[in-house]
Amino acid sequence: VDIWDTAGQESFNKLHPSYYYGAHGCIMVFDATRKITYDNLKIWYTEMRTHCPHIPVIIIANKIDLDPRTTKRSYKYIEDLKVPFNFVSAADGTNVVKIFRDCLDLAIDYKANPPKDDFMAEVMDLLGDDIGVGPAAKETRDDGDDEF
């Protein structure tokens, strides 16, 4: 399992596509006490879906320990997405383990059963988990002894 955390920093924006490559799940986190991060979620989600249209996504509202009223707000954009949504506190640990378990379960299921129109998943299955590994690599590996 590889976990990438860009902390929403703009300096990582150009690197985002490299993080999406080979992803089987995504946890998107916004700060429930700062509306700007909720607004940015729309940008992050759209960008991620451009690169990974099918992977499962869980959206998280963090920092509920700072203002418990945030759990009573309406988050229409997230409701419209129809993706799992939870509240967490990284400071006191509320729901943190649950979120990682849920994401891992979704990612494992996605990897085992990718959508039929997810051609990248099919290509990666042919290549194996690493380039040059897997059934296709065994058939095409050149040991140098054969002539072309």
Can you annotate each of these PLM segments?
Residues 53-148:
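Conserved P-loop small GTPase signature centered on TRAFAC-class small GTPases
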Residues 22-42, 52-55, 64-70, 91:
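Conserved Switch II/interswitch segment of TRAFAC-class P-loop GTPases
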Residues 3, 29, 60:
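Generic enzyme active-site microenvironment
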Residues 1-14:
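Switch II (G3) loop of P-loop NTPases
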Residues 11-15, 37, 95:
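Short acidic active-site motifs
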